[in-house]
Amino acid sequence: MSDTRIFEIYRYDPDVDKAPRMETYELELHGERMLLDALISLKKLDESISYRRSCREGVCGSDAMNINGKNGLACLTNMRSLPKKITLRPLPGLPVVRDLIVDMTLFFKQYLSIKPYLINETPPPEKERLQSPAEREELDGLYECILCASCSTACPSFWWNPDKFVGPAGLLQAYRFIADSRDEETSQRLDNLEDPYRLFRCHTI
């Protein structure tokens, strides 16, 4: 049985277009399991459709976009989970480079501001800085973030203050290093977050 889907895709090239528009495409699926597979097939029909992609395995975070109103990764979104009509927009809250591609500069600026690396002035041992199993377990759920920006760009506080508010992804990474027993900058890291906008713009909405 044929499976035809309708795609409404956000189209905008700021160098050419006066305003964004939505364009409609129809695609009959032939084995495309994931949304990214369908996008690759659509690009064969219209080479001008622009989006990011790389690993296709949910590791790089390149293909994050807004899918039917929710941010997610195209490569991890199964076509069977989607309705017949699929609306694709760029991640909200960041400048659009073209179509589904956004400028991630502000997102990575906030990420870099939390110093996402171990800081330890103690001379390194011959092999490695050891952790107990319990200390290592403290980091579970913290280091897996792939920096796709799906969470930060779903956050209204990040939309309003992207140049000041660290955002969910940045705060997660900040805690990842604060919780790391090998890091010696805990107090400085906390001081770095002590600002009405950097941390305390986070609200339950």
Please provide the spans of the model-predicted regions.
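Active-site phosphate-binding and catalytic loops of NTP-dependent enzymes
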Residues: 46-52
